[in-house]
Amino acid sequence: MAWNTNLRWRLPLTCLLLEVVMVILFGVFVRYDFDADAHWWSWRTEFYYRYPSFQDVHVMVFVGFGFLMTFLQRYGFSAVGFNFLLAAFGIQWALLMQGWFHFLQGRYIVVGVENLINADFCVASVCVAFGAVLGKVSPIQLLIMTFFQVTLFAVNEFILLNLLKVKDAGGSMTIHTFGAYFGLTVTRILYRRNLEQSKERQNSVYQSDLFAMIGTLFLWMYWPSFNSAISYHGDSQHRAAINTYCSLAACVLTSVAISSALHKKGKLDMVHIQNATPAGGVAVGTAAEMMLMPYGALIVGFVCGIISTLGFVYLTPFLESRLHIQDTCGINNLHGIPGIIGGIVGAVTAASASLEVYGKEGLVHSFDFQGFKRDWTARTQGKFQIYGLLVTLAMALMGGIIVGVGLILRLPFWGQPSDENCFEDAVYWEMPEGNSTVYIPEDPTFKPSGPSVPSVPMVSPLPMASSVPLVP
């Protein structure tokens, strides 16, 4: 089926409408917080403690996630560009949604540097979900997904952090598990029966894999900042960085080991190195600020590197062939399963907390055992950590079904590409001259009068071996 992918009016109107709504809502509801307001001057503000972490998280969202998805040979523009678009819209909507739940003072949402970090966390979950549908949806569909995912993320985050009192410093549950299974549910709803017609573009080339590795390295380097960005100042934040650092390092070695072991000639697969090596940062997220101990963090990374790499080899093909889950980036192996592992590790670590390990004040401070939680024990905290993981999975699955089915994203007027034109930049981007393409035009107003054929690069005839004419 050939759908009209000309977005000349639909995309501009959608973007402008959303931004006008943001301007109005910000004008009505958003003001600076105490540290940013000129009425109360002080140079000792939260900004100077949090901004370095905010910078690192910001780079991860826009550079790390964006470039990680450039592995597709003909989808680099869209991977980086659409990630940029949905993240830019998502942070605005996240500031409002999270503000209404967490930062409302009177009738105003007060915004400071901590809001910016939390908004980036929310958008990181959106970027995770983007990986599942990469190459198969239009930018309008992505904006719609972002709007509803940010909304559901804020609700789920409020339930976990405010009602269940769950500890999730690095977002193993709220960010990675939610984003992964929301995205996987949506991509299952949007299943493409004839995606094999675009299979040749679903592969990588040398240069695209190299660009994707840049994204991996940015994510890997800055993940300690990501997991510690909103932890309490002092020992909690310090522990979160150390635990993440150790888990990431161990994950690299086991990912490389398993990748080599699974190849009959012992060669490495770049897909595994790009996507399995950062999984240790995901898995240690919930327990990052707990007394996991450095050796415990190494164990988490060790196990996660093995499971993530095995997932790319065996689980992803199984999900596509048996369950019709077309996971473009393999987010189930980088974010989904490691996120669940992180939730379980957090629950076990919390349940095993003791006075000998934490001390009385440390136990109260680390788990907020005061006020509403003053009668809680470590086992109670561990039990509620499991509840939080289950709630997150339920919210992600139900939310993905609602967005995929309830919003009828399969209808052709969203401008999505047809099955034979997935994973192709030329559908939505002006391509440089001389760049070969296998794009089949879908807009009837631009189709040639004859039958549509894939365009191919012009090849000049080879020179003759001799310029002397041949005579019989």
Swiss-Prot record:
UniProt modification remark: N-glycosylated.
Ranges annotated as spanning the membrane: 10-30, 52-72, 77-97, 115-135, 140-160, 169-191, 210-230, 242-262, 295-315, 337-357, 389-409, 451-471
Molecular functions per Gene Ontology: ammonium channel activity; ankyrin binding; carbon dioxide transmembrane transporter activity
UniProt record, GO biological process: ammonium homeostasis; ammonium transmembrane transport; intracellular monoatomic ion homeostasis; transepithelial ammonium transport
GO CC annotations, alphabetized: apical plasma membrane; basolateral plasma membrane; cytoplasmic vesicle; plasma membrane
Keyword Protease: no
A Pfam family matched in the record: Ammonium_transp
Extracellular face residues: 31-51, 98-114, 161-168, 231-241, 316-336, 410-450
Locations listed in the record: Cell membrane; Apical cell membrane
Enzymatic reactions: NH4(+)(in) = NH4(+)(out); methylamine(out) = methylamine(in); CO2(out) = CO2(in)
Glycosylation site list: 435
Topology in the lipid bilayer: Multi-pass membrane protein
Biological role stated in the UniProt entry: Ammonium transporter involved in the maintenance of acid-base homeostasis. Transports ammonium and its related derivative methylammonium across the plasma membrane of epithelial cells likely contributing to renal transepithelial ammonia transport and ammonia metabolism. Postulated to primarily mediate an electroneutral bidirectional transport of NH3 ammonia species according to a mechanism that implies interaction of an NH4(+) ion with acidic residues of the pore entry followed by dissociation of NH4(+) into NH3 and H(+).
Protein name (database record): Ammonium transporter Rh type C
